């Protein structure tokens, strides 16, 4: 319907209502009609300018970045979620590093819907705005390789973190930095938190995969090399209550890796290390991870401090 028809219809509607209820077309009626016409005109202006009828919630942005990794000696990509309002301010944010699984890439968490989940929770006030970093790890288990010299662990915990802190408004300290991962990435997140105890304040192991030495990739090296990369053996070295970071473990009851994840949960309990353990319905799949994205983000938010240190304000 064009503008003239819309305005004419609004006028006729006001006068028609008066006639139906048996009242005269008085100056009051005409004033009411004018009000309706004015409202219709405003609506027409909004429609013509393409503005939404109600404000849309703000959304974050996912950007792709490539940087030079000194540990790997080559350029490496990562994707980074910047929360709503990031582009228009100077605020600094806590950061979560999310590692993909064996068959995944730096796009896996984005494809699962992590950006949309963060947008929803931030808009609802359920979590604070945060930065999410999703690096590329190929199929390297996020560990320093014992056999070929590829330092995938250092690349993740040092190179990626330093690049983010240098180029984005992250809060560059342990209390405001968490790490997590799914499947192979869960193994990686745990061993990195244990091997770099001053870097992360929380670690999330989602659908945790813990390999035995006999089934580990060859780049894990000898039994002694394996022990330095195995979360089960690393956590034993911390001693009772020895972890300085929050730990979350979840896995589906139909996941083929559930039994070893249970063993890790038991080891933490025996050592007196506080942690969260969740056994949920589900398997080792994208459907399972997508269903729990908001649970993961709530855990990270609760573990992170968003207070900006005074030194970063100067």
Question: At which residue positions do the language-model features occur?
Answer:
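Non-catalytic cap/lid and distal C-terminal segments of serine-dependent acyl enzymes
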Residues: 3-314
């Amino acid at each position: 319907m064009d503008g003239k028809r819309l305005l004419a219809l609004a006028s006729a509607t006001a006068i028609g209502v008066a006639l139906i209820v048996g009242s005269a077309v008085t100056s009051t009626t005409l004033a009411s009609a004018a009000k309706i016409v004015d409202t219709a005109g405003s609506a027409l202006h909004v429609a013509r300018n393409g503005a939404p009828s109600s404000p849309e919630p703000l959304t974050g942005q996912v950007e792709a970045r490539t940087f030079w990794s000194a540990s790997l000696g080559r350029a490496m990509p990562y994707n980074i979620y910047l929360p709503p309002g990031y582009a228009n301010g100077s605020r600094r944010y806590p950061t979560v590093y999310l590692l993909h699984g064996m068959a995944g890439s730096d796009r896996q968490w984005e494809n699962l819907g992590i950006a949309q989940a963060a947008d929803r929770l931030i808009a609802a006030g359920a979590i604070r705005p945060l930065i999410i970093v999703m690096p590329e790890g190929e199929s390297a288990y996020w560990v320093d390789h014992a056999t070929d010299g590829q330092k995938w662990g250092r690349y993740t915990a040092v190179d990626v973190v330093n690049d983010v802190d240098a180029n984005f408004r992250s809060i560059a300290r342990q209390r405001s930095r968490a790490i997590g991962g799914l499947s192979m990435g869960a193994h990686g997140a745990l061993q990195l938190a244990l091997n770099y105890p001053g870097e992360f304040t929380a670690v999330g192991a989602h659908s945790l995969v813990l390999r035995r030495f006999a089934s580990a990739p060859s780049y894990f090296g000898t039994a002694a090399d394996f022990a330095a990369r195995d979360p089960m053996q690393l956590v034993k070295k911390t001693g009772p209550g020895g972890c300085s970071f929050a730990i979350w473990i979840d896995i589906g009851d139909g996941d083929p890796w559930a039994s070893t994840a249970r063993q890790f949960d038991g080891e933490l309990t025996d050592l007196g290390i506080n942690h969260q353990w969740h056994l949920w319905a589900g398997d080792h799949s994208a459907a399972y991870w997508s269903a729990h994205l908001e649970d993961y983000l709530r855990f990270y938010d609760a573990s992170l401090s968003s207070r900006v240190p005074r030194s970063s304000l100067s």
